[in-house]
Amino acid sequence: MELVVEPLNLHLNAETGSTLLDVLRSNEVPISYSCMSGRCGTCRCRVIAGHLRDNGPETGRPQAGKGTYVLACQAVLTEDCTIEIPESDEIVVHPARIVKGTVTAIDEATHDIRRLRIKLAKPLEFSPGQYATVQFTPECVRPYSMAGLPSDAEMEFQIRAVPGGHVSNYVFNELSVGASVRISGPLGTAYLRRTHTGPMLCVGGGTGLAPVLSIVRGALESGMSNPIHLYFGVRSEQDIYDEERLHALAARFPNLKVNVVVATGPAGPGRRSGLVTDLIGRDLPNLAGWRAYLCGAPAMVEALNLLVARLGIVPGHIHADAFYPSGV
């Protein structure tokens, strides 16, 4: 059977029953991958023509834009087909690893957010904006976004208290400095695209600030000169944290513009009142040529996704990380 890979216009012979990722890798086609088990979403690609047997989590998921999306590691070739892979400048390959670490600090960022710092026994490579699974005990395991960069001396996570949440309750009430943890990753596709030269819109709601911090620092500290508009949205003044950190970055890098947005109640000096979606719509009415990184609560991310698409960002340049609750 024949597999056509766009935009490379590459025609490959493949055996029925092979996974798409195996065929791409064996033919040295550049594609991002990590976990190889359908968890991380890194090897996502689009089916243009034909069909594949999809065993992964993309099955039944609403699709943005035209075509059907599959995870290459979970899609099995059954007939001639044509797929589209991400642009080669977006390819990242960070083999998933499990690394031991030690909690070195637990700080109170806000009334319901704790900042964890973890010293890893070995380095863990990841792209800014990705996340990892953190195991505190065999029963307490959850995914959290990295707030820093691989070059940082310690790994940082920002964890919000979830009412009735088993893991967040453990972090807030039982976890102590010196505890051993296991970090598994990296995971996720909402990572920084380094070769993009146009403007960037980075929006973090609540602890969605963690991956946004990673993305923005990754861009700035690697020398990217793109105009970056960062919006940090919170419910009220008491939910604001890392404000000085954001403004310190903006002072160092003139291409970064920071907006701290408070939805309800007084905003305070230097901040803005209202909904992030409303302010972006007024501030940036034409987003053609931009890339967007959207992180936070699902309702906010979904609303932003619709907004930025309407304002001109093509679906492939919208990178979203919605923080769905994991239950108790």
UniProtKB/Swiss-Prot annotation:
Cofactor: binding details: Binds 1 [2Fe-2S] cluster.
Pathway: Aromatic compound metabolism; naphthalene degradation
Domain 2Fe-2S ferredoxin-type residues, every copy: 1-89
EC class name: oxidoreductase
Domain FAD-binding FR-type: 96-193
Keyword Repressor included in the entry's annotation: no
Highest rank taxon of the organism: Bacteria
This protein's record includes keyword GTP-binding: no
Enzyme Commission designation: 1.18.1.7
Ligand binding ([2Fe-2S] cluster): 35, 40, 43, 73
Name of the protein this chain belongs to: Naphthalene 1,2-dioxygenase/salicylate 5-hydroxylase systems, ferredoxin--NAD(P)(+), reductase component
Highest classification ranks of the organism: Bacteria, Pseudomonadati, Pseudomonadota, Betaproteobacteria, Burkholderiales
